[in-house]
Amino acid sequence: MIYDYIVIGSGFGGSVASLRLVEKGYKVLLIEQGKRYKPEDFPKSNWNIPKYLWVPSIRCFGFQKLSFYSTASIMSGTGVGGGSLVYANTLYIPPDEFFNNQSWNRFGDWKKILEPYYDRASFMLGRKKYSKLNIEDKVLEDVSKDMDAHNTFDSVFVGVNIDGSEDESDPYFGGLGPLRKGCIECAGCMVGCRENAKNTLDRNYLWFAEKMGLEILPETKAEKISYHNNLYHIETESVTSFFGNRKRIFESKGLIVAAGALGTLELLLKQKYKYSSLPFLSPVLGHELRTNAETLCAVSGGAEKLNNGLAITSVFSPDPFTHVEIVKYPDKSNAMKWFFGLSVRGADSSISRSWKLFVKSITHPLLFLKTVFNFNWSTNAVIFLVMQTTDNAMKMVWINGLFGGKMKIDNRGNKKVPAYIAIGQEVMERYARKVTGIPQNILLEVFFNRPTTAHILGGCPMSDSIDTGVVDKNLKVHGYPDFYITDGSVIQGNIGVNPSLTITAVAE
């Protein structure tokens, strides 16, 4: 069978493309390397590593993918529904700095262009403001007052059925959509919602798309793409099979790649430099890769329970360029605590910060031991998600090697991405004093000066020319017909807030 379009990836961009194409009557196949989930399939805690983490090489087929490079650490989602399965439901419209970024402002007034599509995305994702102030939110509000930024403190907008009851109903689509239950506020959003309250993509865009004829092929990885005889040829292999990689080839007239910024760049760089099967892709593929100018730090060991409500419930801006949210895991989901150590101030070299951490651990042994033996870390800890609109970027490159090659992130340019954001550190320390908790930094940031992000963006610059961009202003790939990219890789700048709503609106 020859499809009208094949979509690779079922995250926000891929789900939008799939629904809007089948609505127009096209025959569409969606290829997703991850698994399909029902609410009861999700793990009860993130200690259930085979169900939580995506590491196919050791037969872990969860939905949380952790990618470690020498210059950056990246968290992303895998499965039918992509990042929506693991994200913290937070749906924000960015500040004006993003829309005015020089990387794309010459193509139009993006705030005005995207306004109706933000409305459409908000409707589909069920965007609604969380209204409660829990203990941890009130502490963040106190910090905002201390930093003369109380006017920026607010509750967040989320895509969760926060007003529902235990009885199943369709709160979003007037009875046309799937049934849901109400949120029980367990903070389990990032471990997979077992309550069927989270408005994930398989419950909105993909649900309707399948009703209209979309074919979804899960547990299948797109490995090679070629274009000849006016058709795209997609060579795939099974990801989860016990009996080797079952290979299949699919053909289509058009192609949408939306495998997430990381997945899209790996797939396309491989086609250009490993297989030479898409040789006309732009030479700037992989450039302008961004982390959303993001860092993560934490406070743990507080005397009170700090993981109430949803995974993210409140936010404030300590300065005009910075957006800080508190992030929580549910009870008994302590696996992520091992990524954190005692906090160390200063944007020094990794050697200097590592030495400071060693000295602090030796001179404050009780503090160190409290973090190690804190078996209720997810209950008494909050993580600070610090995001900025500051314009910095890295570059993703493909390195051919004896074993097939690999991706590498180059963070040496003029717009080097920092691993340490001083204003975020200050928020963390002020918060720690108020809850008598212990400030913590991510160890990889301290030891290797390596930024960590849950929101990798960019890598496919926008331009009128193939020499300076991968896509045009309509997200069409230069050099090939009916080939589009609709995920985070086409976001042209650091958003400074959670990017899911923007990726959805841009795809719309």
Residue ranges, per PLM feature:
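N-terminal Rossmann-like FAD-binding beta1-loop-alpha1 element of flavoenzymes
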Residues: 5-30
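Residue-level detector of alpha-helix initiation sites
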Residues: 7, 11-12, 262, 415, ...
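Glycine-rich loop(s) and the adjacent beta-strand/alpha-helix scaffold that form part
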Residues: 23, 34-39, 43-44, 195, ...
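Redox-cofactor-proximal catalytic regions of oxidoreductases
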Residues: 49-132
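A glycine-rich dinucleotide-binding beta-alpha-beta segment and adjacent secondary-structure elements
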Residues: 61, 186-189, 227, 382, ...
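FAD cofactor-binding and catalytic pocket of flavoenzymes
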Residues: 68, 83, 87, 93, ...
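Conserved redox-cofactor binding core of oxidoreductases
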Residues: 109-219, 449-452
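An active-site-proximal "capping" alpha-helix that borders the catalytic cofactor pocket
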Residues: 114, 428-429, 502-508
